[in-house]
């Protein structure tokens, strides 16, 4: 065992003494050491309940003959960080989490890990760190939040973000907005729709890294405690059998995750996180081109918020990810999982599917997959749109650019009534390096939707979007403005041509004009001169490469 390097032999007497100071016995030190990676925090609703899950995991580890050691990572709430400088730290925190998991597990000689994340960057960050070690690990995600209810209708956090736009145009009163605020988030869990946190939980299960149904069991459900305990027991088996993550995470496993993502219409942020996870196995193992290629294999089969009327609780009650795998079994590759059964065996074991929520492939919500990669002179390396959450009338759109060099400028313009039907809002210098940190543009997109402009106004950016964004929002434009991408050359009034069916995005300018404009631009000056974001800005790769540190 790896932990023998910490605990075996006369020379390790000082090491054992320190462990005994923590309450561990000689008997404990004969067993596999299992790191239990928690991300509990009192700031994030998706993480406020994770102490209960970590205790359940540790019970499972003990019961099956392992010795658990709990430690924590950070966890940032994108919703609380949204709309201000704090959002610049959200995506970069993924790399801090990965480094923390790698450092703690390697330094203390753990034989296996149980990862307990919930929210957006914490899920991929923990997986990335664990993959660097290539020791057995299982993920038990914290689970979705239940939706709230306002005046007889379900609501959740995005209802509030869009409510701000509705208030600005007089659709609702401040009192009504306050009433929604009181009930939109009723308790623990990740936000109730298929936003980034829940998208990543679903893809983690599809990758084979979580036990079946884990992704959709809700935070307040006792089933979550039971599956946490089962996960703790299972990791001891994986350590004894030496089942490494690279035995599970084959190219085919990543393709399964992408197929599920495309079929469900997951968050566009998955196109950052899945390549970043794969990059820990092999450089450019998975790229945007894989998302593009696989989008031809599956339709959009589930109408879940923000692209539909259902919530995560509906997906769970419809059969969860095993049911999705069952519906897609003609496309799914047969791969290993931490459960011990193969992906197709799990799919075949499903006894019930609600086809009103998880549609059959022959009767989908949309014929096209839920995510789409666009390329053209505006984004030679690609950009991404959640087409499953776009009004079909906006699949093709030509319009004049309204250009803003930050999210803050754009929000002021939107709320100030400076955007009219037909416009294409361009928000630039918000990419991984330029932002820095690639902020999510949920505030502007929600304002557009709340004001009723989402079927007539498009938004493109080298930043990214919340999983809760809907409408014709095209993000991750690569190369970014700070790297001299074409988006830096766009001027007010330039015609932007968007064709989501043809997978194209272009600015209607001759190449010579683009080159001339780019040649006249001043060299990009980093916005932040010290601290973590300064280092991040210098080291981060492009969005089309997963925004990983070089």
UniProtKB/Swiss-Prot annotation:
Names of required cofactors: [2Fe-2S] cluster; Mg(2+)
Position of the signal peptide: none
GO molecular function: 2 iron, 2 sulfur cluster binding; dihydroxy-acid dehydratase activity; magnesium ion binding
Gene Ontology CC: cytosol
This protein's record includes keyword Cell inner membrane: no
PROSITE patterns assigned to the protein according to its UniProt record, in alphabetical order: ILVD_EDD_1 (PS00886), ILVD_EDD_2 (PS00887)
Annotated residues for binding of [2Fe-2S] cluster: 119, 191
GO BP terms: isoleucine biosynthetic process; L-valine biosynthetic process
Pathway linked to the protein: Amino-acid biosynthesis; L-isoleucine biosynthesis; L-isoleucine from 2-oxobutanoate: step 3/4; Amino-acid biosynthesis; L-valine biosynthesis; L-valine from pyruvate: step 3/4
Active site feature: 466
Keyword terms: 2Fe-2S, Amino-acid biosynthesis, Branched-chain amino acid biosynthesis, Iron, Iron-sulfur, Lyase, Magnesium, Metal-binding
Cofactor mode of binding and number, as noted: Binds 1 [2Fe-2S] cluster per subunit. This cluster acts as a Lewis acid cofactor.
EC assignment: 4.2.1.9
N6-carboxylysine PTM positions: 121
Binding annotation for Mg(2+): 78, 120-121, 440
Catalyzed chemical reaction(s): (2R)-2,3-dihydroxy-3-methylbutanoate = 3-methyl-2-oxobutanoate + H2O; (2R,3R)-2,3-dihydroxy-3-methylpentanoate = (S)-3-methyl-2-oxopentanoate + H2O
InterPro entries linked: Dihydro-acid_dehy_C, DihydroxyA_deHydtase, DiOHA_6PGluconate_deHydtase_CS, ILV_EDD_C, ILV_EDD_N, IlvD/EDD_N
Source superkingdom: Archaea
SUPFAM superfamilies attached to this UniProt entry: IlvD/EDD N-terminal domain-like, LeuD/IlvD-like
Subunit: Homodimer.
UniProt similarity note: Belongs to the IlvD/Edd family.
Biological role: Functions in the biosynthesis of branched-chain amino acids. Catalyzes the dehydration of (2R,3R)-2,3-dihydroxy-3-methylpentanoate (2,3-dihydroxy-3-methylvalerate) into 2-oxo-3-methylpentanoate (2-oxo-3-methylvalerate) and of (2R)-2,3-dihydroxy-3-methylbutanoate (2,3-dihydroxyisovalerate) into 2-oxo-3-methylbutanoate (2-oxoisovalerate), the penultimate precursor to L-isoleucine and L-valine, respectively.
Protein name, as recorded: Dihydroxy-acid dehydratase
Lineage, broadest ranks: Archaea, Methanobacteriati, Methanobacteriota, Methanomada group, Methanococci
Name of encoding gene: ilvD
């Amino acid at each position: 065992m790896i932990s023998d390097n910490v605990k075996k032999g006369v020379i390790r007497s000082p090491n054992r003494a320190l462990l005994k100071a923590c309450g561990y016995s000689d008997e404990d030190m004969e067993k596999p050491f299992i790191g239990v990676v928690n991300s509990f925090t009192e700031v994030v609703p998706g993480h406020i309940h994770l102490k209960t899950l970590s205790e359940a995991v540790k019970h499972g580890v003990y019961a099956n003959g392992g010795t658990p050691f709990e430690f924590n990572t950070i966890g940032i709430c994108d919703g609380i960080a949204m709309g201000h400088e704090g959002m610049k730290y959200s995506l970069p925190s993924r790399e801090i989490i990965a480094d923390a998991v790698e450092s703690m597990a390697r330094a203390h000689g753990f034989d296996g890990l149980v990862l307990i994340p919930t929210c957006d960057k914490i899920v991929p960050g923990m997986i990335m760190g664990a993959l660097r070690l290539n020791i057995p690990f299982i993920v038990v995600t914290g689970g979705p939040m239940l939706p709230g209810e306002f005046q007889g209708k379900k609501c959740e956090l995005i209802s509030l973000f869009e409510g701000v736009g509705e208030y600005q145009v007089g659709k609702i009163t401040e009192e009504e907005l306050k009433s929604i605020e009181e009930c939109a988030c009723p308790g623990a869990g990740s936000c109730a729709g298929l936003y980034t946190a829940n998208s990543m939980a679903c893809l983690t299960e599809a990758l084979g890294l979580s036990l079946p149904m884990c992704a959709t069991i809700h935070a307040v459900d006792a089933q979550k405690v039971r599956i946490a305990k089962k996960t703790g027991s299972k990791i001891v088996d994986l350590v004894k059998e030496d089942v490494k993550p690279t035995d599970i995470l084959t190219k085919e496993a990543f393709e399964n995750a992408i197929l599920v993502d495309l079929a469900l219409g997951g968050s566009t942020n998955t196109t950052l996180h899945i390549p970043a996870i794969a990059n820990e196995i092999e450089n450019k193992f998975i790229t945007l081109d894989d998302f593009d290629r696989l989008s031809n294999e599956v339709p959009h089969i589930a109408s879940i918020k923000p692209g539909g009327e259902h919530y995560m609780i509906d997906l769970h009650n419809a059969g969860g990810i095993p049911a999705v795998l069952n519906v897609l079994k003609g496309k799914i590759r047969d791969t290993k999982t931490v459960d011990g059964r193969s992906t197709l065996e799990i799919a075949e074991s499903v006894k019930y599917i609600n086809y009103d929520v998880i549609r059959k492939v022959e009767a989908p919500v949309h014929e096209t997959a839920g995510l789409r990669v666009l390329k053209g002179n505006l984004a030679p390396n690609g950009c991404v749109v959640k087409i499953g959450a776009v009004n079909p009338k906006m699949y093709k759109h030509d319009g004049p650019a309204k250009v803003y060099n930050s999210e803050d400028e754009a929000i002021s313009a939107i709320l100030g009534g400076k955007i009219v039907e037909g416009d294409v809002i361009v928000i630039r210098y918000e990419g991984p390096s330029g932002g820095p940190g690639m902020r999510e543009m949920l505030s502007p997109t929600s304002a557009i939707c709340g004001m009723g402009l989402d079927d007539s106004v498009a938004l493109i950016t080298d930043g990214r979007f919340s999983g809760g964004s809907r409408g014709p929002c095209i993000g991750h434009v690569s190369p970014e403005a700070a790297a001299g991408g074409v988006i830096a050359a766009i001027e007010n009034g330039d015609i932007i041509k968007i064709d989501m069916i043809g997978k194209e995005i272009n600015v209607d300018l001759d190449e010579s004009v683009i080159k001339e404009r780019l040649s006249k631009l001043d060299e990009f000056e980093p916005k932040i001169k010290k601290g973590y974001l300064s280092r991040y800005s210098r080291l981060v790769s492009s969005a089309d490469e997963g925004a990983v540190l070089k």
